[in-house]
């Protein structure tokens, strides 16, 4: 069911809603509805328009500040897109005897052939109780103090508790309720400072129309029928430490074994020194993120280190291959003919030796590397190479006559 909650304004300002009127609409065809509340003063109210689909129920909730036994409203059916009226406006009236009244069904057919069903119910708003919603009780504050507001708006202990401060558990065996009856405290707690509490006793609250001191008398009422309640003691570990469980409506009563107390017998009165210590380590989302970040950083560092270790020797070898070898330091020797026109007997040749080495580009590229120094293939070929001098050559070149 798709529920639409619409607040309809009445002639009186709703300062604090006490009453809720629920209406459920079902149409045989798709149609739009213009809904309007009709008051006794016939003052104008703002209409509300909503769409209905075939066999699709839709719900309205009207909030009122007071309970009125007569509720009047009007309905105008129109086309969904054009807004053209479908027949005349329909006026309906619903009468209430109290908030405990069941749904009131009203089914009719309009002049346009559309069948419309309207079901209406009146209930009290939140924190209002009674047959006409005349009593106020703050259920939220009562729940915080283990109390509840009963059907008449009276402040009583919550189900399963009793005592002046609702701190004592109720033993359902003292009531012996039948037919899903609930054993509760009858004490009415004061809702005002000047009120006094009533006497307390355990009684049975009956359901599904049963009556009697123990809900043993069958008085079936279809409007008060509720679904069978599951056994509250069927829940796993409803009572702890070997306690006996007794259901009491939606609550349980635990009869604790010797040495245990508490609502569920979870508190031990005997203190013993444990022989073992159990340590539970739980990692939060933040700690897991830190560990993952550190692990990724370590893995990334290892990968970078492997690349450096692998490529550093290769780089050194490449640099070694690219180095230019130094040439041999050989003494420079030159021969010079003084008189080329002289006879063979008269020719004079001077040999000049210097200690200054001259390395030109041709010698640089024709010299052999050091590791091939002993190979004659790379030696410089000269006609007559004098042996190197045993002594250091003089600083001034010397001339020898041949």
Curated annotation (Swiss-Prot):
Compartments, record wording: Cell membrane
Predominant location category: membrane
Pfam family of the protein (one): DSL
Chain ranges of the EGF-like domain: 171-216, 229-266
Domain-related comment: The N-terminal region and DSL domain may be involved in interacting with Notch receptors.
Main function: Probable ligand for lin-12/Notch and glp-1/Notch receptors and involved in the mediation of Notch signaling. Involved in the lin-12/Notch pathway signaling of cell fate in vulval precursor cells (VPCs) and in the postembryonic mesodermal lineage (M lineage), acting redundantly with dsl-1 and apx-1. Functions in uterine cells to promote basement membrane mobility during tissue remodeling. Required for oocyte growth control, acting redundantly with apx-1, perhaps signaling via the glp-1/Notch pathway.
Subunit-structure text: May interact with lin-12 / Notch receptor.
Protein name: Protein lag-2
Organism: Caenorhabditis elegans
Gene designation per UniProt: lag-2
């Amino acid at each position: 069911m798709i529920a639409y909650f619409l607040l309809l304004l009445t002639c009186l300002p709703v300062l604090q809603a006490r009453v809720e009127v629920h209406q459920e609409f079902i149409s045989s065809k798709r149609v739009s509805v213009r809904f309007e509340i009709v008051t006794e003063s016939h003052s104008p109210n703002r209409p509300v328009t909503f769409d209905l689909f075939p066999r699709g129920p839709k719900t309205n909730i009207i909030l009122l500040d007071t309970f009125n036994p007569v509720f009047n409203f009007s309905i105008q059916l129109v086309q969904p897109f054009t807004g053209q009226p479908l027949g005349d406006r329909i006026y309906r009236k619903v009468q209430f005897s109290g908030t405990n009244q069941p749904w009131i069904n009203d089914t009719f057919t309009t002049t346009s052939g559309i069948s419309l069903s309207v079901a209406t119910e009146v209930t009290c708003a939140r924190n209002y109780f009674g047959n006409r919603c005349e009593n106020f009780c703050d259920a939220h504050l009562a729940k915080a103090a283990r109390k509840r507001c009963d059907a008449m708006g009276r402040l009583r202990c919550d189900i399963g508790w009793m005592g002046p401060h609702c701190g004592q558990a109720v033993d359902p065996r003292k009531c012996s309720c039948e037919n899903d009856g609930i054993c509760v405290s009858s004490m009415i707690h004061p809702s005002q400072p000047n009120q006094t509490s009533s006497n307390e006793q355990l009684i049975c609250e009956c359901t599904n129309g049963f009556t009697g001191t123990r809900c043993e008398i069958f008085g079936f009422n279809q409007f008060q029928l509720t679904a069978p309640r599951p056994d509250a003691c069927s829940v796993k570990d409803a009572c702890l430490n070997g306690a006996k469980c007794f259901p009491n409506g939606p609550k349980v009563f635990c009869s604790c074994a010797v040495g245990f107390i508490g609502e569920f017998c979870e508190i031990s009165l005997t203190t013993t020194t444990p022989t073992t210590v159990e340590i539970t380590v739980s990692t939060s989302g933040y700690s897991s993120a830190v560990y993952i970040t550190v692990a990724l950083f370590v893995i990334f560092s290892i990968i970078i280190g492997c690349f450096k270790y692998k490529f550093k020797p290769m780089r050194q070898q490449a640099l070694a291959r690219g180095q230019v070898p130094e040439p041999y330091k050989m003494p420079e020797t030159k021969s010079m003919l003084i008189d080329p026109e002289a006879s063979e007997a008269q020719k004079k040749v001077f040999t000049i030796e210097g200690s200054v080495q001259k390395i030109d580009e041709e010698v640089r590229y024709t010299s052999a590397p050091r590791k091939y120094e002993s190979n004659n293939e790379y030696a410089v070929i000269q006609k007559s190479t004098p042996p190197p001098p045993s002594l250091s050559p003089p600083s001034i070149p010397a001339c020898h006559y041949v």
